[in-house]
Amino acid sequence: LLAKALCLAMHLLGLHKEMDDMDTCIRWFQRFIWIGIAMNMVFAIPALFAPGLLTSVVGLPPQLSDPWLENAGMLLVGISVFYMPSGFNAPRYVVHSWLCVLTRLIAVVFWIYLINTSIQGSVFVPMLMGDLSFFLILGILLYLGTTPQNRPWALLCDGWREWRAAWKRQWQSHGFKVGTLVVLAVLGFIGYETWYQMLRVVPEQEYASDEDHYKYAAIGLGIEARIPYYLFAVLPQMCPEKMPKPGGWEVFGFLYENGKDLPIGMAKRQIGYPTVEPNCALCHTGSYRASASDVAVNVPSAPANTLQLQAFQWYAYDCASDPKFTTDAVMAAINSKFQLGFFEKLYNRYLIIPMAKSALLKQKQAYAWQKLRPQQGPGRTDTFNPTKMVVFGFPDDSTIGTVDLPQVWNQKPRESMYLHWDGNNNKIHERNYAAAMAVGATPESVLPPSFNRVTNWLLGHKAPAWPWALDQAKVAQGKPIWEANCAACHDFGRADTGQVTTHIDQLGTDPHRLDSFTTGLVAAFHTFKKPPFDFGAYRKTQSYSNTPTDGVWLRAPYLHNGSVPTLWDLLQPPEKRPVVFITGSDVYDPVNVGFVTTGAQAKASADFNYDTRLEGNHNTGHLYGTQLSDDDKRALIEFMKTL
C-alpha cells in the first residue's frame, strides 16, 4: 500500500514515466539520500558552531544548546558520511543502503521515546515526522529498486546461512574455541563491572525516625541533579580561591549534625556509584542561637535562613569550568581522602567524573539567567523561573521570582489552602512534587514512598515553641490587638486565611514574584501529566496569599521576598524599614523578633548585604499595624511569639 501510495505521488508529480524500471527507483533513492545528507548538514553545522542561534531559530529549549546540540551535530555529520556510499552507488552497496534505511527507523524510535519521556516532548515531533517520512520514502524506493534476492528478508536469510556455515567451519579449530570463550569471558566481566559500578541499585537506607528520614533520605532526583559522593566530598578543596571564605560546605550555610558526614538536606543514594542529592530538608531546615558563640539549634521544617543556595550552585559551576578542574586533579583529591578499589578508580576516572563535569557545565548554561537578576543571598531562592526555563524550556522573560524560603511544618491545616506565596495551588502533593521537579526530580526518578513519608510527617509536625521567657502581661495586652488587626487573614479557622483576598495594588508589596508566575506556566503545568506528577490545580492569581503565622518567630525575615528583617520593622511604615541590612545570621534578636542584622553579632555570623532598592527586593506594602502605638506594637509582638 505504501509503495502504491508513493507511485501515485510520483504520478501526480509527473514522474510516472520514470517509474517504469527499478533503475529509476534507485536513482530517486540516491537523490533522497543526498537530500537527507543536505538536511542533516543544515542542522549539524549550526549545531556545532552556533548552538545558541539554532535553539532560538528552531524554538528548542535553551538548555539543549550545550552539550546536547553539539553531540547531535557530530552524530549527524558521522551519519551523513555513512550515507555517502549509498548516495553514489546504492546497487553496489545494497546491504549498506538498507542500513541507511534502518538508521531512519532507529531515529523514529528514538524520537518516540523522547516525546513520551521528556518534559519538552512536543518540540521533538517535527524531528519524528521528518525521520518517519525519510524512512518510508527511502524504504519504499529501495524495495522497488532491488531484486527479490536483495530485499531485507532474503538478505537476512542468506546472511544467517552464511554465518552458520562459517561458524561451523571455524568451530572445528581448537584455538577458535578457546579464543571465543576468552572473548565472551572478557565481555561478560566488563558487562558485570559496568553494571556493578554504574547501574547496580543499592537499597535506600532505612531511617527509624520520620525526622531523620526527612533530613537524610533521598526523594529521587535525576542523574544530572545528583553529584558523585566522592566529588562532593572533595569539591570545596578543588577551588579554594572561589570559596566565600576558608572551610567546607558550611560556609554556604549548610547545617551539620555531630557524627554525620553529609549536611542536613543532602541524601546519599547509590545507583552503581554513590551520589548525593538535595532533599526537602536542605531548603527547609533552619537554625537559631542566642549569640554568635553559642551552639546553633537546628530546626527541621523551618526556613533555611543561612543557606546560600545560589552561591553554592555557582561555586560548583565555576569550579567545574576552571582549567585546573581536571580528572587527574579530582582523582588525586579523592584518592587522598578515600580508599577506592581498582575498578572503582577506573570508572570514576573515565566515566563518573567526566559525566559529573559535563552535567555541571550544562547546568551552568541552563542557569545563566540567574546572573541577570539581583543576587538571591541567604535564605532565598527563585521558585518558578527554574521550572519555567530549565524544566519547561520557556525563553527568559526577565522576571524575578526570588522569595524567602518558607517553613513547611504543620501542613495538615494547610492542605486545602492556596499557598506558594501567591496562592497558586491548594494541593499539598502538587506543591511538593513541583518543588522537587524544580531541583531535578523526574516522573521516572522520583521515589514516591520516600516522598510520601516526608509529606505525611510534615502534616502533623508542629511549629517550634518560643524558646525564651515571655512577658505574660504583654501577651495578654497583645492578644486583642492581634484579633483586631491580624487574625482575620492569618489565624487558622478564618475564611480568608490561606486565600488571596487583597489585590496587589492595595497590598503594595513587591510584585516581581507575582509577575514571574505566568499564565503560560500554568498551561504548561496543566498539560504535563506523567504519573506521579499531575499539576492540574495550578492557577494564576493577582496578589499574594494570606499565610498562617504559626511559628512566625522563626520565619524571619518577613514578606514574601524576605525584605523586612524583624517583626518590629514590619510594623513600621516602609520609609522607616531598613534599606540595607545583613542577612544570613542565625543569631536571634528576641526583642524585635528576627535575626540580628547589624552590629558585631551580625558581622561575626553573616556577610551578605540585602539591598531593598534592587528590583525584586522592595520592602514596601503590608501596612497593617503600622498605625499602632509603639506600646501596642510591642504587645502585639509579644503575643505573636506564642503563635
Describe each PLM feature range.
Residues 132-154:
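Membrane-water interface at the C-terminal end of transmembrane alpha helices
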Residues 173-643:
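Periplasmic c-type cytochrome electron-transfer domains
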Residues 26-33, 39-67:
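Membrane-helix boundary elements
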Residues 97-111:
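Hydrophobic alpha-helical membrane segments
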Residues 109-126:
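Membrane-helix boundary connector in multi-pass membrane proteins
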Residues 83-95, 115:
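Juxtamembrane helix-break-helix junctions at the cytosolic face
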Residues 151-172:
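Membrane-interfacial, low-structure loops and terminal tails that flank and connect transmembrane helices
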Residues 38-46, 64-88, 101-105:
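Core segments of alpha-helical transmembrane spans in multipass integral membrane proteins
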